[in-house]
């Protein structure tokens, strides 16, 4: 997998990839990553890349030429060009999976200022949002995409870790505990200390469903439940009065 991140603030990206799982993926040559400074593609004095908007209004707008030139400098026939934008599709685990399996080169353009010149969208394949809130720029969304896609790629983390993570089956993760067994009277569930693997797995399956039902019920309909979870879901709905 190759990533090209187009940004006005390359040091933000460099700082993140010097740590964490991305650093390991780079060292193991599981991914390639290039950081493109959009300012390198302006022909204006003082590396200017933004201008006031036509028609008046607050905020500066990124101009077409530096952004489009930066895209064209790295784009190939097999690339997908992503713009981080509050107007885009909301990023989730299913999108991360599809990007990880369907594309070999992902170009991420980080948004900034009041926005982009609308004509830039002609050079964009998909707009992605990470939520309905305002950020200073697109660097954080780009890193979220980078991290969530990369950890899915073969050889980056082990298969068991994937299977146990939240959202892998559209369910939240089960509770986890470590030492001490008793912390201020709050004890670890005895089943986890029993050594009985079947009972432990049953408990974890149940807890996944209970957690999702209570915290993110919107995920339930998209999940693949086993027989125990289906029965438990029926009981949970009955106790809540759902039909």
Curated annotation (Swiss-Prot):
Q: Which SUPFAM superfamilies match?
A: alpha/beta knot
Gene (name only): trmD
Q: Which Pfam families does its entry note?
A: tRNA_m1G_MT (PF01746)
Q: What function does the entry list?
A: Specifically methylates guanosine-37 in various tRNAs.
Q: Which GO terms describe its cellular component?
A: cytosol
- Return the EC number: 2.1.1.228
Source organism superkingdom: Bacteria
PANTHER family (alphabetical) = TRNA (GUANINE-N(1)-)-METHYLTRANSFERASE
The protein's name is tRNA (guanine-N(1)-)-methyltransferase
Subunit structure as annotated in this protein's UniProt entry? Homodimer.
What family does this belong to?
Answer: Belongs to the RNA methyltransferase TrmD family.
């Amino acid at each position: 997998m190759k990533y090209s991140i187009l940004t006005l603030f390359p040091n933000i990206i460099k700082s993140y990839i010097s740590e964490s799982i991305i650093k390991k993926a780079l060292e193991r040559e599981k991914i390639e990553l290039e950081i493109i400074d959009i300012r390198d593609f302006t022909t204006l004095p003082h590396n200017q890349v933004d201008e006031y908007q036509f028609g008046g209004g607050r905020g500066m707008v990124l101009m077409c030429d530096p952004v489009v030139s930066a895209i064209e400098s790295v784009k190939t026939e097999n690339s997908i060009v992503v713009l981080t934008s509050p107007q885009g599709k909301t990023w989730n685990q299913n999108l991360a999976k599809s990007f990880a399996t369907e594309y070999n080169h992902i170009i991420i353009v980080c948004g900034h200022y009041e926005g982009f010149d609308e004509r830039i969208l002609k050079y964009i394949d998909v707009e992605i949002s990470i939520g309905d809130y305002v950020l200073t720029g697109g660097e954080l969304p780009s890193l979220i995409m980078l991290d969530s896609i990369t950890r899915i790629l073969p050889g980056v983390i082990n298969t068991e870790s994937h299977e146990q993570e939240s959202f892998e089956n559209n369910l939240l993760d089960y509770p986890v505990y470590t030492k001490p067994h008793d912390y201020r009277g709050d004890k670890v569930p005895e089943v986890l200390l029993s050594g009985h693997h079947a009972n432990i797995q049953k408990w974890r399956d149940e807890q996944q469903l209970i957690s999702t039902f209570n915290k993110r019920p919107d995920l339930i309909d998209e999940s693949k439940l086993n027989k125990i979870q289906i029965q438990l879901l029926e009981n949970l709905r009955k106790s809540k009065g759902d039909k």
